[in-house]
């Protein structure tokens, strides 16, 4: 026997897809699908077009691994930024969050994962940009502390100053879950790593 829900395969597929977005539960996914499918199909088409454009044009910067729509991102190509400081972050979204604070005017390096770090390219960049300080802007965890020590060890021959953002960022919490005042205070109170 066919049930009502079985007759709505496309709609339920949309709900399932939306539910896969982080922090979106079944009820929220249903509300979004209903709104996009019935109440505002024009918005659904705009979102579809925006997604297509983002997927076609979004890439990572060849210099710092941040999100970019060109080979080199705006931050790396901005000659007015300070070359002496390199802020290491774990994810491209962390660059967005730190840039919104407007507290850091240097350059970035997005790790993504330690396995992906091209230390030869990173060392070349340290020399070319005359980097004097590496700022670790990682959420405080034991794993991230180990990661900082590993990077310091790999780059010790450059005699850099290694600092990390101050505690005040709760342990185990991602940047997007921290208010901007706390994150700004922690960033400006960074300490030697």
Swiss-Prot record:
This chain's function reads: May play a role in DNA repair. It seems to be involved in an RecBC-independent recombinational process of DNA repair. It may act with RecF and RecO.
Organism field: Helicobacter pylori (strain ATCC 700392 / 26695)
In Swiss-Prot or TrEMBL terms, this protein is called Recombination protein RecR
What would you give as a GO molecular function for this chain, any one?
Answer: zinc ion binding
Tell me which family the UniProt entry assigns to this protein.
Belongs to the RecR family.
InterPro entries according to UniProt: DNA_Rcmb_RecR, Rcmb_RecR, Rcmb_RecR_Znf, TOPRIM_dom, TOPRIM_RecR
By its UniProt entry, which SUPFAM superfamilies does this protein fall under?
Recombination protein RecR
Q: Does the keyword DNA damage apply?
A: yes
Which GO biological process entries does UniProt record here? double-strand break repair; recombinational repair
Pfam families, per the entry:
RecR_HhH, RecR_ZnF
ZnF bounds (C4-type): 61-76
Record flagged with keyword Zinc: yes
Name the residues that span the membrane. Answer: none
Q: Which UniProt keywords apply?
A: DNA damage, DNA recombination, DNA repair, Metal-binding, Zinc, Zinc-finger
Which residue intervals define the domain Toprim in the entry?
84-170
Q: Gene3D superfamilies, alphabetically? A: 3.30.60.80, 3.40.1360.10, RecR Domain 1
């Amino acid at each position: 026997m066919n049930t009502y829900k079985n007759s709505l395969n496309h709609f339920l597929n949309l709900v399932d897809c939306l539910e896969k977005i982080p922090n979106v539960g079944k009820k929220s996914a249903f509300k979004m699908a209903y709104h996009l499918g019935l109440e505002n199909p024009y918005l659904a088409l705009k979102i579809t077009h925006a997604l297509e454009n983002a997927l076609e044009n979004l890439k990572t910067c060849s210099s710092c691994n941040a999100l970019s729509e060109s080979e080199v991102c705006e931050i790396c190509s901005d000659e007015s930024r300070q070359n002496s400081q390199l802020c290491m972050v774990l994810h491209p979204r962390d660059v967005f969050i730190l840039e919104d604070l407007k507290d850091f005017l240097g350059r970035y390096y997005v790790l993504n994962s330690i396995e992906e770090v091209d230390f030869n390219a990173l060392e070349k960049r340290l020399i070319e940009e005359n980097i004097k300080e590496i700022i670790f802007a990682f959420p405080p965890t034991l794993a991230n502390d180990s990661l900082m020590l590993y990077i310091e060890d790999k780059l010790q021959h450059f005699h850099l100053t290694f600092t990390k953002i101050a505690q005040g960022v709760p342990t185990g919490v991602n940047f997007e879950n921290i208010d901007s005042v706390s994150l700004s205070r922690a960033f400006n109170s960074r300490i030697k790593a």
